[in-house]
């Protein structure tokens, strides 16, 4: 262990986690690459857990931010009116919302994903006058009490230290037995007065569950869930903190399903540059907040408004979205071939778009593959309740050449774990 790393062992809490998976001291990053203090280069298939969809230190965003700081632009403003916030709101409306025929009010609840989830739950309860929320198995929504209450992971929930109440967990699409119609099961509870389940204020879900195992809901499942919500006057909250901002191939992860959620939670890559920013979008008729009823010191991050506005300009060019879709096809073709070529993995391809991975029934395999990949210069994490999925999450801007290099490292890592000497895929 080097001297720098020993500082973290001595002074930082045991709660730290990613530095255990990636034991290096990083000093520099650009695009989809990172370098450690020894000069070792890594291809980044992690992208800040989805906070760096545009890569590290994007030139357009960096220049806009440097110019703003050099001009003594305001940094902290709570929810006061500033030019950067006005520019961001206008760009979001013109480039993202209007073209998709989405009419949403924008709320800045605080700097992180859990802030937007907390505000969404709070608003849903305020609007409906109901207390209960329906969440789904393997969902992950944050680490504060409200968002943790709608999270499925047992180890995360255990950290709360108190009962997590006013939430009913229902089975996600294809949970357990893939033949079971989980929404028919859910609706039975809503319809039957003897079920013991009250009509909730809202349902909250990810269209692709990130931390829960890269579980992608089918489009027809999402459409049916929206119909159920409308039938029972339940608000539908889509948590797009990780699955949004192009990660699944479109700006919002729900676009392909053709649904219109009542409330949308955004964070991570909405700031563009990796700077903290969160938004809660909701239909105008739900905007019944009293001034200051929900607030937070760091909800006016002007540096993030600057980079977020620059990031949205990518979406003005249709070729950007097309490139995401083209590279997504390559990712899924590679994963499919890998599963077919190495049956010893007992694996299956999971996810959608740039939110993909392989789930393996071989105990510990995913973690071992990720560790071998790191040794070979690729940063990749695991997901799922048992860490049974190794997860591909490269920046959307990655070059085809380095995407292929990443694929080669992953296959080498799979071979190393399985003890296969020669590559099987070509």
From Swiss-Prot:
PROSITE patterns reported in the protein's UniProt record: AA_TRANSFER_CLASS_3
GO molecular function: diaminobutyrate-2-oxoglutarate transaminase activity; diaminobutyrate-pyruvate transaminase activity; pyridoxal phosphate binding
Residues with PTM N6-(pyridoxal phosphate)lysine: 268
One example of a Gene Ontology biological process annotation: ectoine biosynthetic process
Keywords: Aminotransferase, Pyridoxal phosphate, Transferase
Pfam families reported for this sequence: Aminotran_3 (PF00202)
Source domain of life: Bacteria
EC identifiers of the protein: 2.6.1.76
CDD domains: OAT_like (cd00610)
Cytoplasm found in the keyword field: no
InterPro entries per the UniProt record, alphabetical: Aminotrans_3, Aminotrans_3_PPA_site, Dat, Ectoine_EctB, PyrdxlP-dep_Trfase, PyrdxlP-dep_Trfase_major, PyrdxlP-dep_Trfase_small
Transmembrane residue ranges: none
Pathway stated in the Swiss-Prot or TrEMBL entry: Amine and polyamine biosynthesis; ectoine biosynthesis; L-ectoine from L-aspartate 4-semialdehyde: step 1/3
Cofactors (names): pyridoxal 5'-phosphate
Keyword Transferase: yes
Recorded family membership: Belongs to the class-III pyridoxal-phosphate-dependent aminotransferase family.
Protein name (record): Diaminobutyrate--2-oxoglutarate transaminase
Organism: Shouchella clausii (strain KSM-K16)
Organism phylogeny: Bacteria, Bacillati, Bacillota, Bacilli, Bacillales
Gene: ectB
């Amino acid at each position: 262990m080097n001297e720098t790393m020993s500082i973290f062992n001595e002074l930082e809490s045991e709660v730290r986690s990613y530095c255990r998976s990636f034991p290096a001291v990083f000093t520099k990053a650009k695009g989809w690459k990172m370098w450690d203090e020894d000069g070792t280069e890594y291809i980044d298939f992690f992208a800040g857990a989805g906070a760096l969809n545009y890569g590290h230190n994007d030139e357009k965003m960096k220049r806009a931010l440097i110019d703003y700081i050099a001009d003594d632009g305001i940094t902290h403003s709570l929810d006061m009116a500033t030019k950067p916030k006005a520019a961001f709101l206008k760009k979001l409306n013109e480039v993202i919302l209007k073209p998709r025929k989405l009419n949403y009010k924008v709320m800045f609840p605080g700097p992180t994903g859990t802030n937007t989830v907390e505000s969404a739950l709070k608003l849903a309860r305020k609007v409906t006058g109901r207390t209960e929320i329906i969440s789904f198995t393997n969902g992950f929504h944050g680490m504060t009490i409200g968002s943790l209450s709608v999270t499925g992971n047992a180890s995360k929930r255990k950290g709360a230290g108190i009962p997590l109440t006013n939430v009913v967990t229902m089975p996600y699409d294809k949970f357990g037995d893939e033949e079971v119609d989980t929404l028919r099961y859910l609706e039975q509870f809503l319809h039957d007065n003897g079920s013991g389940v009250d009509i909730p204020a809202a349902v909250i879900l990810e269209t692709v569950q990130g931390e829960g195992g890269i579980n992608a809901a089918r489009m027809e499942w999402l459409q049916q869930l929206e119909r159920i919500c409308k039938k029972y006057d339940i608000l539908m909250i889509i948590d797009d903190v990780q699955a949004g901002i192009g990660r699944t191939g479109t700006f919002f992860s729900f676009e392909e399903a053709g649904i219109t959620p009542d409330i949308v939670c955004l964070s991570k890559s909405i700031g563009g540059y990796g700077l903290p920013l969160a938004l809660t979008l909701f239909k105008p008729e739900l905007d019944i907040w009293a001034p200051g009823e929900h607030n937070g010191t760091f909800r006016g991050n002007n540096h993030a408004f600057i980079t977020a506005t620059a990031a949205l300009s990518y979406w003005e060019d249709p070729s950007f979205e097309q490139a995401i879709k083209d590279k997504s096809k390559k990712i899924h073709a590679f994963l499919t071939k890998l599963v077919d070529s190495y049956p010893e993995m007992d694996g299956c391809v999971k996810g959608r778009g740039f939110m993909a991975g392989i789930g393996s029934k071989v105990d510990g395999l995913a973690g071992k593959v990720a560790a071998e990949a790191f040794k070979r210069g690729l940063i990749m994490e695991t997901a799922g309740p048992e860490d049974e999925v190794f997860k591909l999450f490269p920046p959307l801007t990655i070059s085809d050449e380095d995407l292929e290099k990443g694929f080669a490292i992953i296959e080498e890592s799979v071979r190393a774990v399985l003890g296969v000497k020669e590559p099987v895929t070509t």
